[in-house]
């Protein structure tokens, strides 16, 4: 299930200012002996995963339609430029009919076997007003699938970022509240300790994939705060890829579902031993009761 590596034609579609920044970021990766990088994109359906992939590549590499369901299988897009290769893996939505789609996660795991994930983009929408239990269940499912270490290689990407919040809230206040609520959900669902989660330092980046996205004076797609979001996202991706945490290698053990069960398996001998001792103690107590009850008063 390999992907054909093609020359990065879409790179030329970016404004000159964006091209310069991307060349700088990828050059820093090559200086650290990273000649390739693999980015996994996960999230619920309809949050803008595929559109974000298209924006990052600068080409319509993944079909996006508001009137069609998302693809049912993962797709890897690979582009090379100047000796550097970027692989981005688009995936099906992780929710189906209001529940976590575990079948989709199994398909994703199978697709990823023997691959190494340098960065996870966990995608959601900025223009949503609340976080619910389903969001937590999605995080739990991702954690059970890849281990909580995956969150140490994660960026939270909030799409539809050219959003006008309610009149009483500034853009900065709303985006901060929205990102904070999602980060709290990730911490709760991943079951990471407070210090452990703070050390993981999940960064939040914003994206606007619409063709109506505003542009700055350098012709770059810009958010309401003036930020050129594509180079900002790529910089954040390269920062995570080089953050000293181990990349996530998906091996057969993880695919077979034994990853999250290892600790439980190690405890089985201890549990059996404890059960044996308890049974022996109960049997001894019963024998003593029988002996005691058999004595004359």
From Swiss-Prot:
Main localization, broad class: plastid
E.C. numbers: 3.6.5.-
Cofactor(s) demanded: Mg(2+)
Compartments where located: Plastid, Chloroplast outer membrane
Effect of residue 181 to A: Loss of phosphorylation, normal activity
Tissue-specific expression: Mostly expressed in seedlings and flowers, and, to a lower extent, in roots, stems, and leaves.
Annotated phenotype, changing residue 219 to N: Normal GTPase activity
Gene3D superfamilies: P-loop containing nucleotide triphosphate hydrolases
Effect of residue 220 to Q: Normal GTPase activity
TM helices/strands, residue ranges: 37-53
Domain annotation AIG1-type G: ranges: 34-258
GO-annotated biological processes: intracellular protein transport; protein targeting to chloroplast
Entry binding sites for GTP: 46-51, 65-70, 160, 208-209
GO molecular function, one term: protein-transporting ATPase activity
Effect of residue 190 to A: Normal phosphorylation
Record keyword Manganese present: no
Disruption phenotype: Plants exhibits a pale yellowish phenotype.
Designated name of the protein: Translocase of chloroplast 33, chloroplastic
Organism: Arabidopsis thaliana (Mouse-ear cress)
